Amino acid sequence: HPVKARVAIYRAYQEYGVRHFVVDHSAELTKLIDVIPPSRNIVVIVRLAIEHGGAIYELSSKFGADIGAAVELVRAADQLGYATGLAFHVGSQCVDAQAYRLGLEMVNNVVEQTSVAPACIDVGGGFPGDYVNSPIPTIVPFLELIDQTYREMQMPTDCELLCEPGRALCMHGESLVLQVHLRKNDMIYLNDGMYGAMIEEKLGLRMPVRVVESRPFSDMVQAFKVFGPTCDALDVYPALLDLPSDIREGAWIEFQRIG
């Protein structure tokens, strides 16, 4: 994260032993200088903004420096006496492996312009999960392309290649089980919604859904509009859900792959 409070930087360094800090602007580098004495044991990682349409949710409009600014930050951090690294994030649920190649090519561009050997390169997260409306059978092609591109860059042998897998690693490890509090004709009201654990549904991802009950339900299905528990009419599931036509108060519904 390239934006941190000074007290957070201080505590991370002094109390928790953090030695890697991300920046994307000179003002954030100034914070580090004020709080942490320069040392080659401290790695200042410069985050690049990457423009690519392969993710359902981009992050570079909020975070990241362009190549010119990144070059200046790397040079400044190196001259101050910090070790340096480079990072990017392709965005959430990236379905195009070429985005990682583009990011690594941008990293290589910065390295060539600065002639500063990076201590690490972080390709971020964004590795896709397998959803009902976004099937990704395996992330192996993503990893293979990252490995191939990184080898072509011929970085120093002591440069660490890092990544931050999220949903691709843990999505199958958690389900959200919600209870029906009320059925009103073709509408049902659940005990969590868009302002809670269901927020990612707003991104258009559709988790597998099933009713988990010991009692039998009808084999006939019906499309329901699903609301969360708040008073806000925007707290509504963005798609109709096909559920047993006789579903009623007290039933439990499992939303899978929510990790």
Task: Cite the ranges covered by each PLM segment.
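Short, well-ordered secondary-structure micro-motifs
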Residues: A55-E58, D96-Q98, Y131-S134, H172-E174, ...
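Glycine-rich beta-strand-to-loop/alpha-helix junction loops that act as flexible
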Residues: V90-S92, I121-Y131, C163-A168
